[in-house]
Amino acid sequence: GLGDVYKRQILDILNIAIDAGKEILKIYKKNFNVDLKADNSPITEADINSNNLIKKRLIEIEKNIPILTEESLVNWETRRVWKKYWLIDPLDGTKEFINRNGEFTVNISLIENNLPIFGVIYAPEKSLLYYGIKNSGSYKLITQDNINTLSEFKKININNNTTSNIKIIGSRSHSNKDFQIWVEKNFSQYKLISICLLYTSDAADECD
């Protein structure tokens, strides 16, 4: 199994995502009119508050791992020598936030040699927390509160399908062209579904 120190670090990162979600919900639960172009719009405030919390707390865990985020992009010349880095999206699903359908997430990944080795997705409004570890599977938990154990997570069953049947989960209103090109190049058949499908029944169990 996972060592105690490793478990502690996973818990720390999961709690960072939960706390970032709390910051977003503080703003989400207020009544607001969104002016997308305004720098101090609620969406911008939620994004920045989440971003700042995640960065500060990740640095406390491991100050030597660089952080790449939409809020502070780093040029490729600098990034290409990174062996390991955090990739964060402090508020994924801005349209979902604006539409008030709750289908927005906090995303934190640890990338090593350009491949994700650990990732967290938290949908605070849906109280759904997912994490995955390379070679150890993916897990989910319903929670709005901070956690102190991994034992309550439910393992997500992964299908051993061929790549032709792999389902790709992405946010329908947050898809981008690069992602779509990558999917089409690597998978002959795919379904791009709204992240919300993760959050109904056990749809996540059907996804690879």
Predicted segments, located by residue:
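Short, small-residue-biased leader/transition segments that mark boundaries at the very start
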Residues: 1-6, 203-206
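N-terminal subdomain of lithium-sensitive/metallo-dependent phosphomonoesterases centered on the IMPase/IPPase/PAP
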Residues: 4-91, 112, 146-149, 173-191
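Residue-level signal for inorganic ion chemistry
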Residues: 24, 47, 58, 94, ...
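Generic detector of well-ordered alpha-helical packing
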Residues: 48, 71, 90-93, 97, ...
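A short acidic, often aromatic-flanked loop/helix-cap motif at beta-alpha or helix-coil junctions
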Residues: 75-77, 198-201
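Short glycine/proline-enriched turns and hinge-like loops at secondary-structure junctions
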Residues: 79-80, 98-102, 132
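Glycine-rich active-site/cofactor-binding loop and its immediate structural neighborhood
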Residues: 87-111, 118
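Acidic beta-strand-loop-alpha-helix segment within the catalytic core
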Residues: 108-198
